[in-house]
């Protein structure tokens, strides 16, 4: 009756949310995935072989924040390190933004102000003083 039909069964690895959260942190932080401008919840879900909705649940339940807030915090922290680094003192704010994973300088500006209460330009000025 089923001749000619090919049945495929995909085996999914089952991980609990704590294990997924640990893998997520390693992938995003240690491997600097946040520096990819196109990095998204969907690309992370695909890499982990889970749904984007499950990624969101893991972030809320295990990490305590949203995917986007977590990634933007990593980007902002990285931008801060670059702004304070003598090696990057001649990089433009646009360069710093792109190296940190932001799509442009204004997005970095908004996130930086939200996280640190000062702008990237003010941070750079304070570092030079």
Spans of model-derived segments:
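Short, basic-rich loop-to-helix N-cap that marks the start of a DNA-contacting helix
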Residues: 65-71
